[in-house]
Every structure is written in structure tokens, then in C-alpha cells.
């Protein structure tokens, strides 16, 4: 087999001819996707690109990019700079779930990070070069604590959120 097959080179388009053998490789489903939740746990751009390479290797074609949630806002919006100044940061993360019998526990580690508009463009192009469509997700109106911590004037007057949910 040509080495390019193992390097992720897509020029063969799933069709390779071997003497006396014909292999046709085609996906069964038109929508083959994976989701990455960077809203809750930020990952650097390089990790996202590695994930896209892995998706391409397995012929996945839809990348659900979960960019916001209560725990963090991960995409730069120049008109609303507080979304990344405040919303991309949290003091610590809750470990597991809590209830009456099990009090809340936290890891004590600060979390911070977001993607600039240029980085988002680079990710989209990188995905497109691998025949992957990026489906960005921005949570609204639910799961919006990071946005409301950044712009509390947008929330109900009865609710005050000082930082993204831990």
C-alpha cells in the first residue's frame, strides 16, 4: 500500500487498485461526527488540530465544537470583550456531584483559555482541508453562566453570577 495512505493523504479518495483486487471504501452514514467540549474544559488549539487529524483518519466528517457552557466562554467576540476576559476564567472546578450527604469538593486549580477569531478561522480551514465540517455551538439561553458573569446586566435582576460556574 502507498505510504501516503498511512499519512492521512486523502488523494486516493477511498479507491485503491491492486492487481486482481478491487477495494471500494465508502461510509455507510452521511453524517459521521464527534463532539469536543471545550466549554467546560478548555484545550489548546494544537489539541483540537490533533483531534481533527484523528477524525479524518476515521473518516468522520462533522465536528461539533462545543465552545460555551456555564463553565467557560471559549470564543473571542470583539464587540463583547468581557466574554473572554471574565467568562474564559474560573477559580476552580467542582469534582463530581454533590447533594445533602456529599458536600461539594473542588480541585483548587484555576482554568483559563479561549480561541481568538484567527485561531477559529485556522481550525475551520484545517478541518475543511480534511473534508470535515465544523458545527460551532454557543449555548443560549441556557447554560449561559459564563456569559452572564461577564455581562450581569443581561440577567434577571434577582440573579447575580460573579464568575462562571465551577
Regions found by a protein language model. Give the residues of each.
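Feature activates predominantly on carbohydrate-active enzymes
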Residues: 1-158, 162
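Ser/Thr-centric signal marking residues that sit
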Residues: 165
Amino acid at each position: 500500500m502507498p505510504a501516503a495512505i498511512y499519512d492521512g493523504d486523502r488523494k486516493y479518495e477511498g479507491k485503491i487498485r491492486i492487481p486482481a483486487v478491487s477495494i471500494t471504501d465508502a461510509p455507510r452514514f452521511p453524517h459521521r461526527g464527534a463532539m469536543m467540549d471545550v466549554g467546560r474544559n478548555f484545550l489548546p488549539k494544537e489539541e483540537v488540530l490533533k483531534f481533527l487529524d484523528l477524525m479524518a483518519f476515521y473518516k468522520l466528517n462533522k465536528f461539533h465544537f462545543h465552545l460555551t457552557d456555564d463553565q467557560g466562554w471559549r470564543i473571542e467576540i470583539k464587540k463583547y470583550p468581557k466574554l473572554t476576559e471574565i467568562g474564559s476564567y474560573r477559580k476552580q472546578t467542582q469534582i463530581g456531584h454533590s447533594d445533602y450527604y456529599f458536600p461539594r469538593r473542588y480541585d483548587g486549580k484555576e482554568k483559563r483559555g479561549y480561541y481568538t477569531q484567527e485561531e477559529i478561522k485556522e481550525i475551520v480551514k484545517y478541518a475543511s482541508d480534511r473534508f470535515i465540517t465544523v458545527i460551532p455551538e454557543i449555548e443560549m439561553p441556557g447554560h449561559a453562566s459564563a456569559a452572564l458573569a461577564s455581562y450581569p446586566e443581561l440577567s434577571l435582576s434577582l440573579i447575580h453570577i460573579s464568575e462562571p460556574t465551577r
